[in-house]
Curated annotation (Swiss-Prot):
The keyword Transport applies. This is Melanoregulin. It is found in: Apical cell membrane; Melanosome membrane; Lysosome membrane; Cytoplasmic vesicle membrane. GO terms for cellular component: apical plasma membrane; cytoplasmic vesicle membrane; late endosome membrane; lysosomal membrane; melanosome; melanosome membrane; organelle membrane; protein-containing complex.
Length: 214
């Protein structure tokens, strides 16, 4: 089940405690000393060719659905004869998906910078397998906000499966009391436009790939 459907099923209005997840011990405190952002993304890779947005074979970054999709495409491509028709097709799909992922991340960064997080934007967006929710009590709110962003703005391409990493990013915004402001700016910068093809900024010639969750 894709993350979008999972979020829908989780964001019910029942009064039970089924959605409350047990608190897990933090491997890295989210707030440390006088700098509330210093520990966000403690394993942040600043080299674009090594981070989770372009190189999925880093073992820290193959657990999320979209990382596995990209990783599997690369594995299949590498099994083909280089420069063959199938190899070129897969290579183009890999390039397209990477560009889409980079553009989505850039959209989030632009909004964070507009909120005043110029120095903290990259670390706020950094997610690895060591990342955890800051507070299990925020889980429901983070799910609802992520769905709201997906359904009421165009910050994500319409046919793009929601990424688990952005649930953690939204959780961080909630911890900083910046989630609602983030949504307001996202609505202004990337308003929902019915009928507009799901092409990302700067990639008007690239086709949108309906990558399903594995």
């Amino acid at each position: 089940m894709g993350l979008r459907r999972w979020l829908r099923s989780a964001c019910c209005c029942c009064p039970c405690r089924c959605l409350e997840e047990p608190a897990r011990p933090e491997k890295e405190p989210l707030v440390s000393g006088n700098n509330p952002y210093s520990s966000f993304g403690a394993t942040l890779e600043r080299d674009d060719e090594k981070n989770l947005w372009s190189m999925p074979h880093d073992v820290s970054h193959t657990e999320a659905d979209d990382d596995r999709i990209l990783y599997n495409l690369i594995v299949i491509r590498n099994q083909q004869t280089k420069d063959s028709e199938e190899w070129q097709r897969l290579n183009y799909d890999i390039y397209t998906l990477r560009q889409i992922r980079r553009e989505v991340r850039n959209r989030w960064r632009r909004i964070l910078e507009d909120l005043g997080f110029q120095r903290e934007a990259d670390s706020l967006l950094s997610v690895t397998k060591l990342s955890t929710m800051s507070d299990s009590k925020n889980t429901r709110k983070a799910r609802e906000m992520l769905l709201k962003l997906a359904e009421e703005t165009s910050i994500f391409p319409a046919s793009w499966e929601l990424s688990e990493r952005y649930l953690l990013v939204v959780d961080r915004l909630i911890a900083l009391d910046a989630a609602e402001d983030f949504f307001k700016i996202a609505s202004q910068m990337y308003p929902k436009k019915p009928g507009v093809p799901c092409l990302v900024d700067g990639q008007r010639k690239l086709h949108c790939l309906p990558f399903p969750s594995p």
